[in-house]
UniProtKB/Swiss-Prot annotation:
This is ATP-dependent DNA helicase Rep. Binding to DNA induces dimerization, which is required for DNA helicase activity. Helicase activity is stimulated by PriC. Rep helicase is a single-stranded (ss)DNA-dependent ATPase involved in DNA replication; it can initiate unwinding at a nick in the DNA. It binds to ssDNA and acts in a progressive fashion along the DNA in the 3' to 5' direction. Binds double-stranded (ds)DNA with a 5' ss- but not 3' ss-extension and forked structures with either lagging or leading ssDNA. Part of the PriC-Rep pathway for restart of stalled replication forks, which reloads the DnaB replicative helicase on sites other than the origin of replication. Keywords: ATP-binding, DNA replication, DNA-binding, Helicase, Hydrolase, Isomerase, Nucleotide-binding. Disruption phenotype: No growth phenotype, resumption of DNA synthesis after arrest of DNA replication (upon UV treatment) is slower than wild-type. Cells are filamented, slightly accumulate DNA double-strand breaks, have viability defects at 15 ng/ml ciprofoxacin. Double priA-rep deletion is synthetically lethal, makes small colonies but not lethal in association with priA300 (which has no 3'-5' helicase activity). Synthetically lethal with a priB deletion. It holds the Pfam family UvrD_C. The gene is rep. It comes from Escherichia coli (strain K12). GO terms for molecular function: 3'-5' DNA helicase activity; ATP binding; ATP hydrolysis activity; DNA helicase activity; protein homodimerization activity; single-stranded DNA binding. Homodimer in association with DNA. Its EC number is 5.6.2.4.
Length: 673
């Protein structure tokens, strides 16, 4: 498929800073992959001097595959395509000495972070889960805004902020002592390093001579600063973004970063991609008219050559049960009449709690469905167990990982033994693993617990020595040496479950082997690099799934970003739901409108909205108003369902069940042919 004029211009402009305003479905990934090919083939850039950065592993993998298909593996070798956090990790791995760190650092995931902060804040924060989560978010926001603990303390206003800043200082000191980083450090540390160290900054500016950034509207303060530091005064970069799809301000994203670009880089070239290759003209008209109610610095209007398309429907329901019943009935009928696949349908909602009643009706009618936000491969207990072992092998200072593995499988090392070991280690400023080898420890510990601990740590030290010479053999010996398979069969609910879990362990081992050996496209990695890469993938892939089965997709509007479906149901189109009540209270309607815009532009062929006349909220019955966003849409393109005569709940239930029963009978007859 040939590039359209806007895409062609975006690909060929390489002489200065470039902002590509890419509307929904406008083919931005094609632009990025073609631009990389143009830089290498047409402009003389070497692949190793080009970096492309995006926000999810899935997007990075897709980009890598497309570039590989366009250029071939040999030409693309050395090209850096990754997420922001993986790029940050690469900088830290190469510059650990300048950061005052040891090379064998490891990464904390959110479970480790929560456990550590719970321990550190004992006596400072009552056992309050909500307050603890607020502390985690506050520390994350401080790091995203490039604030160190001392700066956070200096700018603290009020008692709560002062306590939080103190906790941040304790947390930061503990991470440094354990040679551990958390997720936000992967951007914070490289950014501060490049700000403060001219030699390192010049080295990376020379290494990355052209930078491409996708989903730029999702960048936060530290990511924007990192981009500026990497491109320097040369300013050879392309950022691709859409201010109308900025929906992550709650996690630090700043859509104003798009506007700041033109101030920081006055020579900025702005190129708009307005042709949409996804949706019908009618769907785009609705999206354009809705989003026009937001203030804009950059005006754009999406258009399509895919035809005007079907009218948009608005279905009214008596309550949430009726809403789910109606959507399920409509979906079954549409599927039967149009001979579609279930994966062609998406049910999108504002909050996760809205999914339950839809699950109930889909399940009752044996409709296969999938809720996005499932368990990442790397979040599975057996994978986290093995990664914890590897974290201790590569970073003996990682107490969090040590405590996870010390009794997995069971080794009769009891809590009293671990408590004494922890106290011994703390007084000597050592990690628990390192302290376990101290000669004097036998005076504090004795008996079976001490013997079991010594056996375990000496065995692990042997594996550690082998890992330095033969990492693949070491991991194989580790899995066999702890007899993990037997442990899985003992602790899993069924032999089948144990078999599946062991299959996951073998899959991880297979991936590790590939990464340690390297490939045509990727250099061989060290065991430390492999472990940190896997830990990072777990943190970034929560909710991502590679499987694409024939299932109706249920997901939040936030989770739907970047996806497309032929038939979309946007449910709960009421004031208080979309826009969300907290946004109404805080007068932050613009972002909620962008969220509705994202939902509308997921639909390719047909779009149906639903709303309820009554809903139960916090045990009370409320009668919500229709969403203002429905009223902002072009009414000529909407079919509002006509009011029907009021029927009792019993009659409606009987009628609905009868309708669904008829549809199921038709489907059963069809299957029986």
């Amino acid at each position: 498929m040939r590039l359209n004029p806007g895409q062609q211009q975006a690909v060929e402009f390489v002489t200065g800073p470039c902002l590509v305003l890419a509307g929904a479905g406008s083919g931005k990934t094609r632009v990025i992959t073609n631009k990389i090919a143009h830089l290498i083939r047409g402009c003389g850039y070497q692949a190793r001097h080009i970096a492309a950065v995006t926000f999810t592993n899935k997007a990075a993998r897709e980009m890598k595959e497309r570039v590989g298909q366009t250029l071939g593996r040999k030409e693309a070798r050395g090209l850096m395509i990754s997420t922001f956090h993986t790029l940050g990790l690469d900088i830290i791995k190469r510059e650990y000495a300048a950061l005052g760190m040891k090379a064998n650092f490891s990464l904390f995931d959110d479970t480790d972070q929560l456990a550590l902060l719970k321990e550190l804040t004992e006596g400072l924060i009552e056992d309050d889960k909500v307050l603890l989560q607020q502390l985690i978010s506050t520390i994350s926001n401080w790091k995203n805004d490039l604030k160190t603990p001392s700066q956070a303390a200096a700018s603290a206003i009020g008692e709560r902020d002062r306590i939080f800043a103190h906790c941040y200082g304790l947390y930061d000191a503990h991470l440094k002592a354990c040679n551990v980083l958390d997720f936000d450090d992967l951007i914070l540390l490289p950014t501060l390093l490049l700000q403060r160290n001219e030699e390192v900054r010049k080295r990376w500016q020379n290494k990355i001579r052209y930078l491409l950034v996708d989903e730029y509207q999702d960048t936060n303060t530290s990511q924007y600063e990192l981009v500026k530091l990497l491109v320097g005064s040369r300013a050879r970069f392309t950022v691709v973004g859409d201010d109308d799809q900025s929906i992550y301000s709650w996690r630090g994203a700043r859509p104003q970063n798009l506007v700041l670009l033109s101030q920081d880089f006055p020579a900025l070239k702005v190129i708009k991609l307005e042709q949409n290759y996804r949706s019908s003209g009618r769907i785009l008209k609705a999206a354009n008219i809705l989003i026009a109610n937001n203030p804009h610095v950059f005006e754009k209007r999406l258009f399509s050559e895919l035809g005007y398309g079907a009218e948009l429907k608005v279905l009214s329901a008596n309550n949430e049960e009726h809403e789910a019943e109606r959507v399920t009935g409509e979906l079954i009928a549409h599927h039967f009449v149009n001979k579609t696949q279930y994966k062609d349908y998406a049910i999108l909602y504002r909050g996760n709690h809205q999914s339950r009643v839809f699950e109930k009706f889909l399940m009752q009618n044996r409709i296969p469905y999938k809720i996005s936000g499932g368990t990442s491969f790397f979040s599975r207990p057996e994978i986290k167990d093995l990664l914890a072992y590897l974290r201790v092998l590569t970073n003996p200072d990682d107490d969090s990982a040590f405590l996870r593995i010390v009794n997995t499988p069971k080794r009769e090392i009891g809590p009293a033994t671990l408590k004494k070991l922890g106290e011994w280690a703390m007084t000597r400023n050592k990690s628990m693993f390192t302290a376990s080898f101290d000669m004097g420890l036998s005076q504090t510990l004795s008996g079976r617990g001490y013997e079991a601990l010594t056996r375990f740590t000496h065995w692990l030290a042997e594996i550690q020595r082998l890992a330095e010479r033969e990492p693949i053999a070491a991991v194989r010996d580790l899995i066999h040496g702890m007899d993990y398979e037997s442990w899985l069969y003992e602790t899993s609910p069924s032999p089948k479950a144990a078999e599946m879990r062991m299959k996951n362990v073998n899959q991880l081992f297979s991936w590790m082997t590939e990464m340690l050996e390297g490939s045509e496209l990727d250099e061989p990695m060290t065991l430390t690099q492999v472990v940190t890469r896997f830990t990072l993938r777990d943190m970034m892939e929560r909710g991502e799934s590679e499987e694409e089965l024939d299932q109706v997709q249920l997901m939040t509007l936030h989770a739907s970003k970047g996806l497309e479906f032929p038939y979309v149901y946007m449910v709960g189109m009421e004031e208080g739901f979309l826009p969300h009540q907290s946004s109404i209270d805080e007068d932050n309607i613009d972002e909620e409108r962008r969220l509705a815009y994202v939902g509308i532009t997921r639909a390719q062929k047909e779009l149906t909205f639903t709303l309820c006349k009554e809903r139960r909220q916090y045990g009370e019955l409320v009668r919500p108003e229709p969403s203002r966003f429905l009223l902002e849409l072009p009414q000529d393109d909407l079919i509002w369902e006509q009011e029907r005569k009021v029927v009792s709940a019993e009659e409606r239930m009987q009628k609905g069940q009868s309708h669904l029963a008829n549809l199921k009978a038709m489907m059963a007859a069809k299957r029986g042919k």
